[in-house]
Amino acid sequence: MNTIEKFENIKLFSLKKIIGGKTVNYGNGLYCNQKKCWVNWSETATTIVNNSIMNGLTGGNAGWHSGGRA
């Protein structure tokens, strides 16, 4: 049984041209694709609690990460 497969590296520029099937995770429980957006409320609640605590402990210098991650 051969467990190692040869694969080709894809450049980021080429990868960005692929359309469809992409879901963006914004890191706070919000997810969006081309058709809809939805919220994972347990992830959102955890993010809010974590960021609130870290903001309190660091005097406002931590938490509230924003920005999409594809």
Curated annotation (Swiss-Prot):
<dbReference type="Pfam" id="PF01721">
    <property type="entry name" value="Bacteriocin_II"/>
</dbReference>
<keyword id="KW-0044">Antibiotic</keyword>
<comment type="function">
    <text>Heat-stable antibiotic with bacteriolytic activity against Listeria spp., E.hirae, E.faecalis ATCC 19433, S.bovis 83, S.uberis 42 and L.lactis.</text>
</comment>
<dbReference type="InterPro" id="IPR002633">
    <property type="entry name" value="Bacteriocin_IIa"/>
</dbReference>
<feature type="signal peptide">
    <location>
        <begin position="1"/>
        <end position="21"/>
    </location>
</feature>
<dbReference type="GO" id="GO:0042742">
    <property type="term" value="P:defense response to bacterium"/>
</dbReference>
<feature type="disulfide bond">
    <location>
        <begin position="32"/>
        <end position="37"/>
    </location>
</feature>
<keyword id="KW-0732">Signal</keyword>
<protein>
    <recommendedName>
        <fullName>Bacteriocin ubericin-A</fullName>
    </recommendedName>
</protein>
<keyword id="KW-0964">Secreted</keyword>
<dbReference type="GO" id="GO:0005576">
    <property type="term" value="C:extracellular region"/>
</dbReference>
<dbReference type="GO" id="GO:0031640">
    <property type="term" value="P:killing of cells of another organism"/>
</dbReference>
<keyword id="KW-0929">Antimicrobial</keyword>
<dbReference type="InterPro" id="IPR023384">
    <property type="entry name" value="Bacteriocin_IIa_CS"/>
</dbReference>
<dbReference type="InterPro" id="IPR023388">
    <property type="entry name" value="Bacteriocin_IIa_dom_sf"/>
</dbReference>
<comment type="similarity">
    <text>Belongs to the bacteriocin class IIA/YGNGV family.</text>
</comment>
<keyword id="KW-0078">Bacteriocin</keyword>
<keyword id="KW-1015">Disulfide bond</keyword>
